[in-house]
Structures are given as structure tokens and as C-alpha cells.
Amino acid sequence: MTTTVYVQDVTLRDGMHAIRHRISPRNVARIAAALDRAGVDAIEVAHGDGLAGSSLSYGPGSHTDWEWIDAVAGAVTNATVTTLLLPGIGTVAQLDEAYRRGVRSVRVATHCTEADIAAQHIAHARELGMDVSGFLMMSHMAQPADLAAQAKLMESFGAQSVYVTDSGGRLTMHDVRDRVLAYRDVLAPSTQIGIHAHENLSLAVANSVAAVEAGATRVDASLAGQGAGAGNCPIEPFVAVADLFGWKHGCDLFALQDAADDIVRPLRDRPVRVDRETLTLGFAGVYSSFLRHAEDASARYGVDTRAILVEVGRRGLIGGQEDMIVDIALSLSAGVP
């Protein structure tokens, strides 16, 4: 039986973290058009923290979500336009507006133990007729059976697929496999499973492959790995590996390579790679989007970024607690344990 993979590109959503959510609609349209020509199944677009994520806490966007969504919707003919929504940040009204502008798929994201807060948004998206996924962030912080129970909740609300979301790039291949298999044990056969990997431990492609081998059919990836921390699963090597395995997908490898090298890499103000800071994210199990916040605090208060990230991991901070990074930096600079 041939394995078919649904490839969703996240360059224009998770990738926003890598460029501080600052990109022109023109460049968004260029990237979206290139991805569409390259044959990806879906293109996710929004502020890095989802609809309405632009703020002082998460980082202000250079443009509105609507400008970016319009740019993507106007540039694609085949790929599904997708967005991300975090309940408590994005609202049902904003989901309606995204739908009006051409978004037909949404991932409703919560912390891995808080699926219950997604009920209203998932149900409303289904009422709109959207393709709806549950997105359990920081999946390394819950054991497989506990995570699967949260996935089952999202399914009960109406999610048609649920993701193992390795926001901290902390999972190993065995960890991913165990979580996907735990999902499969409790979810209906018709409910798809997805994987969202980060490269902080240099395992993004390997983890995505392990997930597919365990039964996942949806894979997040991005051009040149554009994403928070050391980036997401780089789409070019993932597609190359998928070809070697004989998996079915619609992507043109050379077209993806061209888009990555000619369009995306030149837009960066910081290399997206495994280095001493991003490796620390994975090792300490820290939310990948905390990287730029920690680097800013390091520069301001004269504290090693790695020390900040290790303390963030020790405290178990999660998305939405970005303000605590400054508190940690101040404490470390004052020698307070």
C-alpha cells in the first residue's frame, strides 16, 4: 500500500518568528506563488502566534493578518489557504473574517494539556465547512497516553485531524513514534494524524519520517526550514526522503529548492540553524519562539542567552509567558537563583 503524505507549508506562519513577523505582502505573495507552483497541499499564513498574535508580548507584525492572507489568497490557485488560531488570542469573529478572505483550513492550537479550551473554535470552524485540525503544542510535556486523551477531546469537538506538535524541538524519534501510535489507538480511523517538528536537536526530518512510518499522514514543513528556533522540518530534504521511500505527494523538489534559496534565505536577519542558542532550546525543552525574546533580553541585561533558556526550561514556561523571560534575565543578572 502506497503511503500518501499531505504536505503543509508553514513558512508564512511559523516562519514569521524567524523574521520577527516582519515581511511585506509582496514577498508573502512571492513565497505563496512559488509554493503553489511547487505543489504543496496547503499554505499556512498568519502572525507567528496565529490570528491576532501581533502584540507587544508576542511581537508586533509589520502588517496585519488580513494583508498577509489577502496576499496568499491572491497568489495561489491549487493549494489550500490555511491559518492558525490560539483560543484566547484569536477569536471566532476573526476566524469568520479569515474565511471571508479565502482561508479554508484552520489549526486550532492549545497547550498540550488544555484541549478543552478549543471546543468553541473547532465547532465554529466545522460549521463554516473548514478543514479543521487540533494542534497540541509542546507535546513533549505530556506522556503519550495523556496527550492522546487530549487529542481525543479535540476529535470529539469536531477536529478532523490532530497534530503531535513538537514546539520545543525536544522529541526524539521514539518519542514521536510513541505519541503517534497512542493517537492511533484512541482516534477514529477517519481522523488523520499530523506531525509538526522543529530542528533544535537536528531531528526534524527524522522525526517527521518516524511519524509517517507510525501512521501520520500530515506533515508540516517549511522552505529552508524557516521557523522558530532552529526552524521547522525543512521541506526540501523531507520531500527528497519521501521520494526515496516512494511516498506519494504532489511536490516538485527542484521548485522547492529554488524557492528556499532564491526567495526565503535572503529575507533572514538571523540564520535559521542549529547553533548554541537553538540547540539549548531543544535540550531544555523550551518553546522555540522564545529564542528571539531571550536573545533580546540577553543583549539588554548582559546575560548568556543559554542561561536564560535553561532557566525557562527549568521553570516549565509555555507559550504566552514571554514576559517572564525579562524577569528571568533580571534575576540572573542580579545573581538571584
From Swiss-Prot:
Q: Which PANTHER family match?
A: 2-ISOPROPYLMALATE SYNTHASE 1, CHLOROPLASTIC-RELATED, HOMOCITRATE SYNTHASE-RELATED
Name of the protein in its database record: 4-hydroxy-2-oxovalerate aldolase 2
Q: Which organism is it from?
A: Mycolicibacterium vanbaalenii (strain DSM 7251 / JCM 13017 / BCRC 16820 / KCTC 9966 / NRRL B-24157 / PYR-1)
Coiled-coil blocks: none
Gene3D superfamilies for the chain = 1.10.8.60, Aldolase class I
- Domain (Pyruvate carboxyltransferase) spans 5-257
- InterPro entries given in the database record: 2-IPM_HCS-like (IPR050073), 4OH_2_O-val_aldolase (IPR017629), Aldolase_TIM (IPR013785), DmpG_comm (IPR012425), DRE_TIM_HOA (IPR035685), PYR_CT (IPR000891)
Stated family: Belongs to the 4-hydroxy-2-oxovalerate aldolase family.
Xref: HAMAP family: HOA
